[in-house]
């Protein structure tokens, strides 16, 4: 078992309330990702679950037992940090087996468990090597292996891939996804990278200033953001947000779009993702625009256009279509994919 529940959890640092009454249930075997911008409280919340930070108010339960005041060693959890924190003078095998050694396990038990975990992480041929001879990705796998050998109730990951270069991060994301499928263990993962969140999570918790902004599957958050904050945070590149008054009063939009914009009341902003806009030639479509910037990314090309007072609108296109800067074009919106947000940022579509 590995279920974790937070009940009305709060955290203060002196007079500053950094975690604001969070209720959250993490299910046994779930891969849950805590995501949000810097300073949103995601790492603090993870450390509170692990017992590395005190909980000011509320309760933390692991498998139904209240552990709010338990020290980290009594919670049965294992943490992997951004820093590998390996002992440089110990071999890979000794590093991985260190938690079991300090717990007083027998040598044969330690050896068997380390070898089993090393096989899962493809570290068998590195067991006799020192950390300094390993790549960054291999060192992180050793750090993960050290947490696995303890057979914890759940794993807590605090931005474990942020020290790796872009290519290694992609590889390690795949390794973590495979590891979760194999272990079927509960994993709570903190990141500021929403791509990591989208590719790894069963569910994502989006945090904003110490509060939960939305919880849901990656698909749910991407397609049905509850508010403007989630709409702009989830997705790469982010959703185009246009002030309602700017687009409605623009002389560059056609009557079909103008009529559609009036189907909702109390609208302050509209949002539409880059893939839900198509470029049409001869300035036809819903909006007249001029190509300002072209970003070629291989399989996709992103075109940023200037459309009167609307600001820069980004469109995703296939790379086999050629465009030139300064070309006058039209934008065709997929009307059913437009999101309407009120003055408080609430999605009026939901």
Locate the predicted segments by residue.
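ABC ATPase nucleotide-binding domains
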Residues: 72-229
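Conserved coupling/switch loops of ABC nucleotide-binding domains, chiefly the family-specific signature
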Residues: 56-59, 109, 209, 338
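The feature captures the beta-strand-to-loop junction immediately N-terminal to the Walker
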Residues: 35-37
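Conserved ABC transporter NBD signature motif
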Residues: 58-66
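Pre-Walker A (P-loop) beta-loop-beta motif of ABC nucleotide-binding domains
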Residues: 22-33
